[in-house]
Amino acid sequence: MEYYSTHINKLIEQLSHLPGIGPKSAQRLAFHIMNMPKDQVEQLTSSITGAREKIRYCRKCCTLTDQELCPICSNPKRDASTIMVVENTRDLAAYEKTGKYERVYHVLHGAISPMLGIGPDDIRLKELMKRLQTEEIKEVIIATNSSLEGETTAMYISKLIKPTGIRVSRIASGVPVGGDLEYIDEVTLLRALEGRVDL
């Protein structure tokens, strides 16, 4: 039996596709949106549409940005000889919040996961390897999550880079196994970076 109108049901269904939003949360959000002033709803839809249309991948590091080069890659004060490889833009933001990492990044937008059918060609590895061939890189710090997929990705990247002679390191433990970097506090992230080990 349908309790709500077709439009409300459709809104609930669409909201429930968002990560971390189950049916109950989607229902709460839908009714909150229905009770918002019309101009706020229009601003919300405009922001979503605008972000989807304007946001793209940085030409260099592949993070999400609204410019050709993100603010980090276009900052001449950054040490561009060291690249930290992260799984997503949220992980990049977690390291940026520490205020201590003054080098550059490369965002993979995923991790290798044979179980989910995600292989090396499905993440931004080609772009990373191109950077290593065209830029003066001394070190690659692999900061993928400590999940099985993150470890698999780290080992794969290490094997790709080793023949180039570029130093490859992995952030130290301290980040819990299976933990996502975006949820780790700044002190733990800094210790993991400082305690990195060569692969």
Q: Which residues does each predicted region cover?
A:
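Conserved, well-folded catalytic cores of nucleic-acid-processing
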Residues: 14, 18, 36, 51-54, ...
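Extended interfacial segments that mediate partner engagement and assembly in macromolecular machines
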Residues: 26, 75-141
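Conserved phosphate/pyrophosphate-binding and hydrolysis machinery centered on Walker-type P-loop NTPases
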Residues: 19, 38, 51, 63, ...
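Cys/His-rich Zn2+-binding cysteine-cluster or related metal-binding knuckle/ribbon modules and their
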Residues: 2-8, 17, 27-92
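Solvent-exposed alpha-helical segments within well-ordered globular domains of core cellular machineries
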Residues: 9-13, 27-31, 42, 46, ...
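Residue-level signal for pocket-adjacent positions within structured domains
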Residues: 28, 43, 56, 68, ...
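Long C-terminal interaction/binding lobes of large macromolecular proteins
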Residues: 102, 129-141, 146-199
